Swiss-Prot record:
Protein name as catalogued: Myoglobin
Residues bearing the modification Phosphoserine: S4
GO cellular component: extracellular exosome; sarcoplasm
Spans traversing the lipid bilayer: none
Catalytic activity: Fe(III)-heme b-[protein] + nitric oxide + H2O = Fe(II)-heme b-[protein] + nitrite + 2 H(+); H2O2 + AH2 = A + 2 H2O
Name of the gene: MB
Natural source organism: Ziphius cavirostris
Chain positions with Phosphothreonine modification: T68
Length: 154
């Protein structure tokens, strides 16, 4: 399940492009998540009232949350699989406070892949997509293990 150094380099190369606009990427990813899987919106009291894509695009709170999500994910990706310290508090909050099912992390992973491909097609070809998919699967597998330790089977 681990990634090779070459795969991590592909992941981190495209992630550098994401970091140039964390808020914009994050907002677009969350909008794609909420539009594709409206049930996920119910986990966010702050965003439940946002019904249209236009409302979502106008929401500064959504943009800020997108920035927060991608900042955390970037910190995890940069650890190249050695993300225990970063993952623990994230798993704790997502399992016990927010109660986010692993399935929702799959949904956001799909949204991430889609947005990166649409925004950075020349930097996110098949090899980079495969590497990012693998990195996100590793993240989900490890967070699922933490969920289990915490007694959350979401």
């Amino acid at each position: 399940m681990g990634l090779s150094e070459a795969e991590w380099q592909l992941v981190l190369h495209v992630w550098a492009k994401v970091e140039a606009d964390l808020s914009g990427h994050g907002q677009e990813i969350l909008i794609r998540l909420f539009k594709g899987h409206p049930e996920t919106l119910e986990k966010f009291d702050k965003f439940k009232h946002l019904k249209s894509e236009a409302e979502m695009k106008a929401s500064e709170d959504l943009k800020k949350h997108g920035h927060t999500v991608l900042t955390a994910l970037g910190g995890i990706l940069k650890k190249k699989g050695h993300h225990e310290a970063e993952l623990k508090p994230l798993a704790q909050s997502h399992a016990t406070k927010h109660k986010i099912p692993i399935k929702y992390l799959e949904f956001i992973s799909d949204a991430i892949i889609h947005v990166l491909h649409s925004r950075h097609p020349s930097d996110f070809g098949a090899d980079a997509q495969a590497a990012m998919t693998k990195a996100l699967e590793l993240f989900r597998k490890d967070i699922a293990a933490k969920y289990k330790e915490l007694g959350f089977h979401g």
